Amino acid sequence: MGRCLTKKVFLIQSPILFLHLLISLSSGAVKPDLKGVCVSKGGRFPPYELEGKPPKSVGRGSKDLTLCRVFRKKTCCSSVQTNPAFVAVRNLATYGEASQECLELFELLECSICNPNVGIQPGPPRICASFCDRVFEACKDAYFASNALKRVIGPCGVNDDIICIKASNWESNGTSFCEAAGFAVQRNDDSREKPCYGSKASLESVVESWSRDSRKETPLKTETLSCFKDLLQWVREMTTIQKISLGMSFLIAGMFLIRQSNNRNQKQRLAAIQRTARRLRGNGNGDSYSAAINRRTSSD
């Protein structure tokens, strides 16, 4: 693909990678010596299983997080928290008519509960007002519904079609939108006494850390990642007909490789039989046996 088509592949062109970057950038100034214990958020957020214990890493496999996995190295979350967040994002994608940017930012908002700094703070997740404004601006035309039981708004679900309206009809700005969704909002993003999720200071510190990690990558890893991004973008931009054609090409190529492998295996088996025949030439029967094998090979 001409050295992977191009080197200029931006993360924003790949929604999955862009989302992971957004989560990393908004993860707050997570420090290795983070102290404190997990405090359940109350409201619509399920209690932490680590209530009263410090945040810890989450293993992969059956105990892995169903969402927000960027925080698995240090978090108060378990699947108890990420399952509802996963459902909310899925509903927004399925019924909310949300843009890609809205989906990414709303998932980032839902994942705030898994940020270790947020986990040790009392009360609902404290979100920076500037970040709430970004989420609302991206999601104001997406459809949300009011949950009468939990007294919050959330993405429309399968049973919410009657009272499903645009976010801009529920609230008029980012602060009221976040509060209506069950979050606390902090107006001063740069407060050191009370850090909030998505502050400018935390973004800059994590960007610097992320840049250091990126420079440590080997050229081979960087090249491989670039190739993967280019291939992913190329496939996304293909039409349905082109994707079907590409799939058929892969199928035909696979069948050709299987046939080649079978032919090679058959030749290897015949060669082994011939070697055995040559070892038997010491007796009379061996010569006739070898001749028979040679005739079989010639006929094939």
Swiss-Prot record:
Expressed in leaves. The keyword DNA-binding does not apply. GO terms for molecular function: folic acid binding; folic acid transmembrane transporter activity. One of its GO terms (cellular component) is membrane. Keywords: Disulfide bond, Folate-binding, Glycoprotein, Membrane, Receptor, Signal, Transmembrane, Transmembrane helix. It is found in: Membrane. The chain crosses the membrane at residues 238-258. Residues 1-28 form the signal peptide. Glycans are attached at residue 173. GO terms for biological process: folic acid transport; response to salicylic acid. It is a single-pass type I membrane protein. Disulfide bonds join 38-76, 68-111, 77-114, 102-139, 132-178. Induction: Induced by salicylic acid (SA), correlating with the accumulation of folates. Pfam families: Folate_rec. Belongs to the folate receptor family. Folic acid-binding protein involved in salicylic acid- (SA-) induced folate accumulation by triggering uptake and accumulation of folic acid in cells. May be implicated in the transport of the folates from the site of production (leaves) to the site of storage (fruits and seeds) and utilization (roots). This is Folate-binding protein 1.
